[in-house]
Amino acid sequence: MSFGRPGFADVFKPSPPARGSFPLDHDGECKAFMISYLKCMKENANDNGKCRLFSKQYLECRMDKGLMARDDMANLGLGDVVDPSALPPASTQTTTAPLSNPPHVPQPPSSEHRI
């Protein structure tokens, strides 16, 4: 019996995924990152563009814990995602070049020069 396919057909040979297989996170090492990502997806009506930072953090956790092979984030489509907490605050940024002509601020006349 052929059970739905011709008996002369070649045997099906599965092919492995292009990036290999990823072990499951049985110990929950990256569960917090996964929950953050899923929460973001729910809050943003499954718009993954708004949750790319969470996706990057989750993949970094998996790579750090050995749950997937280390790869460059650009290869994973997340090379342009920047963590805003890693940036210096805007108030502490200073200019490196001094002002050549500082703006003139008029001063009120002193009482000594009044007539």
Curated annotation (Swiss-Prot):
Specify whether Mitochondrion is a keyword of the entry. Answer: yes
Disulphide bridges, residue numbers: 30-61, 40-51
GO CC list: mitochondrial intermembrane space
Region described as Disordered? 1-23, 80-115
Alphabetized Pfam families for the sequence = CHCH
> What domain of life does the native source organism fall in?
Eukaryota
* Protein family: Belongs to the COX19 family.
- What this chain does, per the record? Required for the assembly of mitochondrial cytochrome c oxidase.
> What is the name attached to this protein's record?
Cytochrome c oxidase assembly protein COX19
What gene name is given for the protein in this entry? Answer: COX19
